[in-house]
């Protein structure tokens, strides 16, 4: 993995737009915010990715994540098996768009060429978000009166699980090159992501559809980060194993 034994990092936060007051579970709109956020950042990686798959929501991963969120534990699920995982906690509200943005924000600390993270920083959230082969995501959220492992009370806990998991030792999150130039067989390029047939059909049925291009060339893990946010201060606590 990328690092270990990371000390707490304290940052200041000014949030202008706060959305989502998630309770015991996520609404369809909230699920869309999370999924769209992941796909947006995956499509915008720099340098571009040759093989970035478009993510889709998975009900089984959602149920798995929700069940763990209900336990209100500030630690990774030791029984998650072959599932990637990102955790995020925030008070007094839960801003889902900001959560994904924050995970992706670790990009500035990550060097794709050397596959290294700036010492003392975290990159595991980001690399899971943009892990090219990860194509399924499911998340759960819970308002916890008390989260085991956090002193503060009244926190929202977000758990996202991924399949297949990212952050595999010795591997980069994606291959740099012309967008979609190495999409798997049967997938087409939609907004710089390798999308399946269903995604293409949905775009064709939409009045404001984006362009759909064929890949320019044919083609025949687990995040261990924790993010805790308390307004108006941000406390980023994490460890990568």
Q: Model-predicted segments: where are they?
A:
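Mature extracellular or exoplasmic CAP/SCP-family domains and secreted bioactive peptides
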Residues: 2-241
């Amino acid at each position: 993995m990328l690092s270990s034994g990371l000390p707490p990092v304290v940052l200041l936060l000014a949030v202008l737009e706060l959305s989502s007051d998630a309770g015991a579970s996520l609404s369809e709109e909230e699920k869309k915010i999370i999924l769209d956020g992941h796909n947006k950042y995956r499509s915008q990686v720099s340098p571009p990715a040759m093989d970035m798959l478009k993510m889709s929501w998975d009900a089984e991963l959602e149920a798995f994540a929700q069940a763990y969120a209900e336990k209100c534990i500030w630690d990774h699920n030791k029984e998650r098996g072959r599932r990637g995982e990102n955790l995020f906690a925030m008070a007094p509200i839960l801003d889902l768009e900001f959560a994904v943005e924050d995970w992706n924000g670790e990009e500035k600390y990550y060097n794709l060429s050397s596959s290294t993270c700036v010492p003392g920083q975290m990159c595991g959230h980001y690399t899971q978000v943009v892990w090219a082969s990860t194509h399924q995501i499911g998340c759960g959220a819970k308002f916890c009166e008390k989260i085991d492992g956090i002193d503060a009370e009244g926190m929202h806990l977000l758990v996202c699980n991924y399949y297949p998991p990212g952050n595999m030792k010795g591997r980069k999150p994606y291959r740099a090159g012309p967008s979609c130039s190495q999409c798997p067989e049967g997938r087409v390029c939609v907004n710089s992501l390798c999308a399946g047939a269903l995604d293409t059909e949905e775009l064709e049925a939409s009045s404001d559809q984006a362009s759909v291009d064929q890949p320019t060339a044919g083609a025949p893990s687990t995040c261990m980060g924790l993010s805790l946010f308390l307004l108006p201060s941000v406390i980023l606590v994490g460890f990568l194993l």
